[in-house]
Amino acid sequence: IMPFDVEHDAEQPLGFLMANRDGEKLVFITDSYYCRYTFSGLTHIAVECNYSLRILDENIAAGRVHPAMRPRLLRSHFSLENVLDFLRANDMSKVQEIHLLHLSDNNSDEALFKRKVQEVSGKPVYIAGR
């Protein structure tokens, strides 16, 4: 297990790269809005996908989310858009499956997130239980 720094507004947030003797490698990232690292040889990805910028902005415009929440979300949680960029930046050739974690109750859409991640990755995508 190898910890690595991730971006978040809390102190010392970490992601983890885990490998086993069979050559499987899992990257686990949650409570982060960005990962500066790229990984090769991953077989499994478990990554936060908390909100969509579009959905968040629609909820702010409709009064369902206070506008003051937007800057904090942008600096503390992975958006769908950043997750897609993260996946594009990584070697996906050995990835067997992707698990999306920590979806927002109000600012996410499970079906949309699953479809978009599958389109970008070409891999099976699962939504973690809430």
Predicted regions and their residues:
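Cap/insert and terminal regions of metallo-dependent hydrolase folds
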Residues: 39-129
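Core dinuclear metal-dependent hydrolase active-site scaffold
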Residues: 1-44
